[in-house]
Amino acid sequence: MDFIDKLQQSYNLIEDPNLPKFNGGLVGYFAYDCIRYIEDRLAHSSPPDTIGTPDALFMLSEEVAVFDNLKNKLHLIILVDAENQKSEANERLDELEDKLKQPLPFEDFSAPKETISESDFISGFGESEFKHSVEKAKTYIEEGDIMQVVCSQRMSLPFTADPVALYRSIRQLNPSPYMYYLNLEDFHIVGSSPEILARLEDKKVTVRPIAGTRRRGKDEKDDLAMEQDMVNDPKEIAEHLKLIELGRNDVGRIAEPGSVEVTEKFGIERYSHVMHMVSNVEAKIKDNLSAIDLFRATFPAGTVSGAPKIRAMEIIDE
């Protein structure tokens, strides 16, 4: 993480309102287990690694193609030293443009035709073991050790189609604000989410806790009924309030004193299949801190850990 911080500081991108917000830089992921490099209390626990992928992997993107779906416009961007490499940048842009104009070989990205049922998925936990972990978590809550914890399990399934087909299916069936497809040679990452971990823009920090979910209604009346059921559910409200407080505490670790505020509370966001309850926490980051400091303060999201966060993650490891 220190290396990434130093690398980021070595780049000074010129802001241009005509360019997309992302115009080059690091693209990749931090896995959940990166928390062991951040929190000392979790450094020595080591659950088995069942998939054998790196804890973090990033690509430095110095040649970027950004397609604006709304404007039907393609941006080609090259990162170079503005003073000394302008002619080289133009040459690379020409090469990239020529490459994009070449015809592509035919590839079948259609989704596989076979039918998949829930029974085809393989759990890394097992039903009885998972139920036992839930009961144990409830005991911790009753004893006052934690307020909430997110029990989860990995589900796996053999997949023979092209990962692009999976990404396209997700875009069609369950589009979300944040969707991703990463081809990392040895493996691919495909997914979608309505949620950010944190955002840093012009010194302004934003986190958006999401907790509370209902299905979309069959019609407008049913949809509104689902919304009312969610916002009047004491369990959903209690969980959401805990995550707002967790977000405030996380952001407060790197924020200017007195700058943390909740700018939206219990908002409703609707997606293709579900609706969520969402709040917004904002602050101003301290002048001597960076995006990596913000990451360390907020990772992982409370929605995949619990509250208090560190104790909840100790219980997840257990």
Predicted regions and their residues:
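Extended alpha-helical targeting/anchoring segments
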Residues: 1-318
